[in-house]
């Protein structure tokens, strides 16, 4: 029996692309194909707004190449968020983006670039241009503070089509900020379950925010010490109000951790879940820490491995371990 999976209108964006469920409100969308490739027993089609469609004649999707990756390129950041799962610091190290493994990315791979603050990496522009030459689809996640400080530079990079999606971790929602976000069609606001609440989400809607990605709270890194009962209460409150939250935005997405914490599956029929859920961590995706030269199933995996000679060999290793039920530390 043939199968089809669709990730709709999710800009090739930001961190935790693995397994996102995107449930758009009904709206006509006109899309241009920007990439088509065969992956194992299925075909992948990517559109200019980030929509991705998988199609197969079989009963399941069996990949033989990486589709998307979360990539850390720096551990330097001057903000010091107390919940940062990467433990980034003002004197954190940058990755060497001349590492030859970069050249092994296959065309149309979606690369979610993060840190730290990726905007402070001295090789960022050259790196983005190289990924464009490789026909990859890079995106970035930045903090609101850095988005405001580097707005003109970000707009220039976007206009040069050096990245396709921009995830912005929000700290203080204002009208000026929302207006700036609206200038980048590929921008998606990132919020963390437990650190945001229903009223904040309603305020975003009132200010015209259209795309939101809810990330699960990572009890990892500095986030482990910062976690408390108030955060858990906020998570519980979001979960209890998901029926209302799902109506607020044109596109609402969740990473795998938020899917679990907020019980997102309960919002969908079995048919919708089969269509929109894009897979578990490590099924089509992986995490690469270019600073420490290791890789894992996800950014919260405690089990990490030294970089291999190609990106795809690393993905196939993660997938094989996953299929063998090897504990990967998530």
Where on the chain are the PLM-derived regions?
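Core AdoMet radical
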Residues: 68, 87-95, 108-121, 131-150, ...
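Residue-level recognition of short loop/turn positions
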Residues: 80, 115, 291-292
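Alpha-helical scaffolding segments of alpha/beta enzyme cores, especially the outer helices
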Residues: 123-133, 153-156, 179, 199-203, ...
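N-terminal [4Fe-4S]-dependent radical SAM core
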Residues: 2-71, 273
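Cysteine/selenocysteine-centered motifs that mediate thiol-based redox chemistry or coordinate metal-sulfur cofactors
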Residues: 317-330
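Canonical Radical SAM [4Fe-4S] cluster-binding loop centered on the CxxxCxxC motif
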Residues: 59-97, 299
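Short, solvent-exposed coil/turn segments at beta-strand boundaries
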Residues: 38-41, 107, 288-294
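Radical SAM enzyme [4Fe-4S]-AdoMet core and its adjacent flexible, acidic
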Residues: 6, 11, 161-313
